[in-house]
Amino acid sequence: MDEVDKIIMHQLHQVDAGIEPTDELASFTPELVVRAVSSCLTEIRPELEVPRSLPGGAMAQRFSVATGLAERCKESGYHGDIGYQTFLYPNPIELRRLLMFLIEQLPRERQATDDLTGKSHPLSGREMLQRQIRKKLTAQLKAMWVPQFCRAVGNRKSHGCSSLCIDFRPKLNLNVPSANLEERTKEVQQYFDQQAPNLFQQTASSSYDLIASVLHKNDLERWGQGLTDSGMFLLASEDPVIPMVLATEKPSATAAEMTPLEELTDEVQKLRTQCETLLGERKAYTARIGALKQRESEATKELADIQPLLKLHERTCLVLADPEQNVTKLEALLQATEAKRRTLTQQWQDYRLPLLETLETLKTAKEAQHVQSIRSGIEQLEQELKEKTQQHNDLNTALRTATQSLAPRKEYTRRIHEFIGNIRKQRADIFKVLDDTRQLQKQLNVVGAQLQRQFNYTDDLLFQSAKHDLHAKKAYKLLAQLHANCSELVECVALTGNVTKQIRELEVQIDGEKLKNVLTSLQQITGDIQKFEQSIQELQSQISTMENGVAKA
């Protein structure tokens, strides 16, 4: 099983780089078993959340972690005998079966990628983090989006939203009289006293909210007459809702007279018409102001272009007023400017030559320093090349040694084919033995039936003759005794076969128990039981201390 263990360790190292390869599975500790199984389960089913390590504290936590991993393995399709003892008290045989099953269940995507790249490498911490982020984002993108107010309180909290859920109910334009009594006529006051519904009656419907309606009414009274920059009333688009009068409304005296409500409606209509007229005038004035501003900007730009030309014309006119004197002044100014230029040129040359010499010196020094750095770099590279060459030779030597010491891949393949051939051969031998056993059983049944029929026939003949012949009577007794002895012999042979079968089964079971390291497992179980007893004693001492404290208090 050394080759199988090496293959298992190689696969585990590819799944989790923290699992160092060892020579055999017998050296696996419970912590290493938990880490290997959890890594394989995470690769097989990424949505599972399994513990990556075994707690080192209380035994109850260790038992719960081991039991959870055993259940996850059963959910993944493992049908073997598995429980918490598989992880806390591992034996090489059961552990080899479990790890071989998990390795067979690993996804083939990683193996295909390794085959394409020509090499296999364990997952680094960065790759594992990227894989977890990719899985998390994929799960979130596949999940259905639900608005915040449609989620439950716990769901909203888990998504970082507020746990408050406020039902939306629209506002209502309340019909409330003005607080100034002087602004209300007698008819309006009579209407609000007798016919108009109160606030609670206006917001009695479940679709309106009283507080929102009152706030809306206050905003209307405060900002209703103001205009926005776009020339629209702030709340003019909302038509006031005229509530229905109650059943106690009295009919008007005459149809020709207008009710206060109709007068208010007529006044509102007039104000609305006047407002629309004012808005149209305002739009016209705004357009006219924009055109005037455009003309002003064009005139300002044209003025800025004309001012330099005007200054030039003014200076030209001043020169042409006295041409001879102005030409003499210009010639004198040119001569003075030329002399000043020559002086400045001489001063610049005197200042420039030392700077050029200094610049050449600095360039030469810099080039020399650069050449020196290049030489030192070349020497360093030569030294590194020698070291790399020596390292390459050493690695080639180690590779040849390792290639000679380790069996190649073909050798592993050949051994696997040999194992498969031996298994097939054993299977064929088993089937052959079973067929021979069935044929022998058939022959035994046929011979037994023939003997039974022969005995019955002989028994009938001797029984008929025994009535008249003494020798026939003795022969009948001997026949009955022979039949009884033969039956006892057959039963003895059957019992011997059953005992032999049970002996072989017990021998196989004994060999299996020897391989499971029962003594080591019993020692570990004894240690765990002692830890349990110690923790129970500590709890009992704490309970007694608390009881004494309570009794004293």
UniProtKB/Swiss-Prot annotation:
Residue intervals passing through the bilayer: none
GO terms for MF: cullin family protein binding
UniProt keyword list: Coiled coil
Database matches in InterPro entries: CCDC22, CCDC22_CC, CCDC22_N
Family: Belongs to the CCDC22 family.
PANTHER family noted in UniProt: COILED-COIL DOMAIN-CONTAINING PROTEIN 22, JM1 PROTEIN
Protein name per its UniProtKB record: Coiled-coil domain-containing protein 22 homolog
Native source organism of the sequence: Drosophila pseudoobscura pseudoobscura
